[in-house]
UniProtKB/Swiss-Prot annotation:
RNP-binding as annotated region, ranges: 165-252
Gene3D superfamilies: 1.10.10.180, 1.20.91.10
Gene symbol of the encoding locus: M
Molecular function, one GO term: RNA binding
Function: Plays critical roles in virus replication, from virus entry and uncoating to assembly and budding of the virus particle. M1 binding to ribonucleocapsids (RNPs) in nucleus seems to inhibit viral transcription. Interaction of viral NEP with M1-RNP is thought to promote nuclear export of the complex, which is targeted to the virion assembly site at the apical plasma membrane in polarized epithelial cells. Interactions with NA and HA may bring M1, a non-raft-associated protein, into lipid rafts. Forms a continuous shell on the inner side of the lipid bilayer in virion, where it binds the RNP.
Remaining remarks: Most abundant protein in virion. When expressed alone can form virus-like particles in transfected cells.
Name of the protein: Matrix protein 1
Subunit structure: Homodimer and homomultimer. Interacts with NEP. Binds ribonucleocapsid by both interacting with genomic RNA and NP protein. May interact with HA and NA. Cannot bind NP without genomic RNA.
């Protein structure tokens, strides 16, 4: 796996699934391939994205600044600086300074990542803030190692939270989660179906599923009534893809 592929993997792991994630993935690919060289426009686009947390925007802005060629004197962006200040916690800043000194002596991506993983996400974000404001004091490989370590810390906590929700025994939460998944699956089906004549059937199935979820929420239904709803939709999607000559077996 190449270094930039690894960085892209870690960065995308902290972004919530949805159309915006697909859009960000495309921007990252373009940046890493050297196709997008307008840093100013890229940062303005990032700043106005909905849904993303300030920290996620800060990390993405940091990665873009690091990888898009730009003039040395380019103004640092306030939304990135604010996100990477460790919540203003002096403890985070103290640890960040210690980590920064260690990273200045490191030269490899994996070495930097190993060192960084022993610090909290707050300290790591603060360290990124230090580097963002004094770009150039640490090698690019080392900085990318720091980025990946930060994303791993964040993804770990997100995974724990997600696992708690998935394994909850509360039937109401499980019911709502199944309906949300069914609704987002239906939306994805509509987007994938496109405008061809053969797509009408898939669009109809997706539309009916969304109407069903809406009705279930309006009238209130038994928590078990949503069981299997998402899988039924995925089976319909796979059947549609098979007729279109596309074989995708990895959705479930």
């Amino acid at each position: 796996m190449s270094l930039l592929t690894e960085v892209e993997t870690y960065v995308l792991s902290i972004i919530p699934s949805g159309p915006l994630k697909a859009e960000i993935a495309q921007r990252l690919e373009d940046v890493f391939a050297g196709k997008n060289t307008d840093l100013e426009a890229l940062m303005e686009w990032l700043k106005t994205r909905p849904i993303l947390s300030p920290l996620t925007k800060g990390i993405l802005g940091f990665v873009f600044t690091l990888t898009v060629p730009s003039e040395r004197g380019l103004q640092r962006r306030r939304f990135v600086q604010n996100a990477l200040n460790g919540n203003g916690d002096p403890n985070n800043m103290d640890r960040a300074v210690k980590l920064y000194r260690k990273l200045k002596r490191e030269i490899t991506f994996h070495g930097a990542k190993e060192i960084a993983l022993s610090y909290s996400a707050g300290a790591l974000a603060s360290c990124m803030g230090l580097i963002y404001n004094r770009m150039g004091a640490v090698t690019t490989e080392v900085v990318l190692g720091l980025v990946c370590a930060t994303c791993e810390q964040i993804a770990d906590s997100q995974h724990r939270s997600h696992r708690q929700m998935v394994t909850t025994t509360n039937p109401l939460i499980r019911h709502e989660n199944r309906m949300v998944l069914a609704s987002t699956t239906a939306k994805a089906m509509e987007q994938m179906a496109g405008s061809s004549e053969q797509a009408a059937e898939a669009m109809e199935v997706a539309s009916q599923a969304r109407q069903m979820v809406q009705a279930m929420r309006v009238i209130g239904t038994h928590p078990s009534s949503s069981a299997g709803l998402k899988n039924d939709l995925l089976e319909n999607l796979q059947a549609y893809q098979k007729r279109m000559g596309v074989q995708m077996q990895r959705f479930k």
